[in-house]
Amino acid sequence: MTDPITPPITPNDGWRVRILDLSEGAEDGIVEDVKGFVNLDHANLFARRYVRDSIERCRAAGMPAGDVLAAWHAYGEDAEVLEAGPAGWRSGDDAQPFAEVRAPVEERDWRAIDPRLVSFGEDEPEEPA
């Protein structure tokens, strides 16, 4: 039996977040797997912000939460942290509250922490003297 407090072991290829197309546009619904996260918390935050932004992009002015959620399920994108077990973020518990309350910009900004777009200092050249 595993200790529920012990975090999952980092997969050999690092943490990955799977982006899923909720419409019928992608084979098996998979858009891509994003890799390069510093740790599990980074992957979880990216997945959460990505879904938060996707739900907001499906929202029209004055739209009730149920309609926002229906639009997201029809046209949006989901994200899940792979191989993280219960420690990995999934949209299940958060989608409804996200649909109920419009998100502040900082809760949607997945690009600021996207490992494909941001260097986290490991390979950056030194500052010129």
Spans of model-derived segments:
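Mature extracytoplasmic domains of secretory-pathway proteins
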Residues: 44-52
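Short, mixed-charge low-complexity intrinsically disordered segments
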Residues: 52-129
